[in-house]
Amino acid sequence: VPSNTLDQLLVQLDELKRDFDRNSRARILKILAQLERRRFADADSLSRFHETLLFIRAYPPSAQILRRVEKILSSFSTRVETLSEAGADLSPLENVEISGVSGTFVEDTFSYSITRWLVLRHPSQVSIDWEAHEDEYRLAATWPRFLPLLEEDALVEANVPYLDWLHAAKGRGLRDLGWLIERFERLPLAEKEKAELYESLKLYVRWELGDSRATRTLMKRPVRKIFYHTKPLLRRSDVSLAREFAEPSIPLQRLSRSQGEAVLNLARETSTMRYRELYGFTHGDARRVFRADIGRGVEVFLMGVPPDRRLPLRAYHAGLIFKNGVPACYVEGLSLFERMEIGFNIYYTFREGESAWIYARVLKIFRQLLGVTTFSIDPYQLGYENEEGIESGAFWFYRKLGFRPTLARVVKMMKAEERKLAARPTSRTPARILRQLSEGHMLLEIPPAFRSRWDKFQIRNVGLAVQRRMASRFDGDAVKIRRASVESVTRALGVRTKDWSENEGRALEDLALVLALIPDLARWTKDEKRDIVRIVCAKAGTAESRYLRLLQRHSRLRDAIIKLGS
């Protein structure tokens, strides 16, 4: 190694992490040995080292290098403690892109569901940061539910010692957060009402990570066999979606409930420590978790949500993707008929990996599992009001995979930019142009999908149509429109719901709001009406995949919904 200054060693290691020849492997080992002995004086350098190590852990060139990387990672809690004792500024380790390092903490106003889960999963590591709490009025409004006579103080006095009241009530040996969560759990309220009440308090919860296996530093799912990289990584130009969809089906394994719960715990941990919360991880159905081994050391875990947590119209699925046991990316799919709105997110550390190939394989799994043939990318994913998407050139990532914009003005601008890039291959699209290109959705249609069928559709338009009907015919009363919609739709369909389950009744309430917008529903054929009833019941069934398959077979309902949403 020609130079052994800390910065140069870090730069060299970062440059070598994607080189897999024998000479590079030897150089990586030598640099790792030097860096392992170094004492880091600042958090920036330590975080750079940490992220490069995690990349190598996910994309290891050899078993020897992997062992050395894991040995160094196991020392990070001590390294962070050493920095702290030296008075170093640790704030770089709190950055949302690199939070979750051993020896640090994460702190946020987490949702009720995640806070309750943290208390159950990591009881000794989570606590309330009372110094960060600012809204005492919310304590006055909420705590009298489980602190008798608190109103005597809170309603009329200034500077109420709320913590004195809390500590007197909970007694010794109990932690504030655990005691409070238990009180909320005992309230005679529905789950959503408990969540709204707790979240109104805006309590900052601190999770001290220590040397927990839940940290980004140490989190790793056990794998049977590591995939070692000895050749260049697959690039986007190596990936063909058409070729992927033509390949044989990928085997899917449904996990047991306990295995599914273990995966969901990993998903919640990896998201929470990154200050993210994904609906499907927080509320995932442990009974409906599927695993797919897609090759090259990559495992995909997909999950749905239970009937009482489902969206009113779209089917919801989420996924966590591991590379050699390391969480590398996550995905979220929102589906209606054959159309899926898909959000795919590579964790910052792994964006120089095999992103395009993994993405293509995930699309194939969704196509296989759910029957979807039209994939839609939201403008935010492309860079609309999202500078990260602009900097990464997300629009071109999707365009080169075969996606197309749906807005005519964006198509015109894209074609002009493509001509410029063809004439000057080394040039880059200015950020100003990328922002304009990101203003509309992009679609990918896979045969037998009909081109342009979903170009103008937005699910929000369906919801807004319901609001306009509520305003014009029901004086803005949500209870009235729900009741009237159920009555008119069940009458039109000729169905009795006396013996329906609670979940089926909830699904009917939601779907009836939309079905009531179809003016000629009562004149549909007997078979078409029967199939709608089956669709409603499937929305409340064990798996939303059946709901989607039934929707995909109902061409008349598809046409009506597309018209409402376009």
Task: Report residues per predicted region.
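Glycine-centered secondary-structure boundary/capping sites
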Residues: V1, A315, R351-E354, G494
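Long, charge-dense tracts
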Residues: R116-A267, T272
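Charge-rich, low-complexity amphipathic helices
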Residues: E388-G389, R419-L421, T426-S427
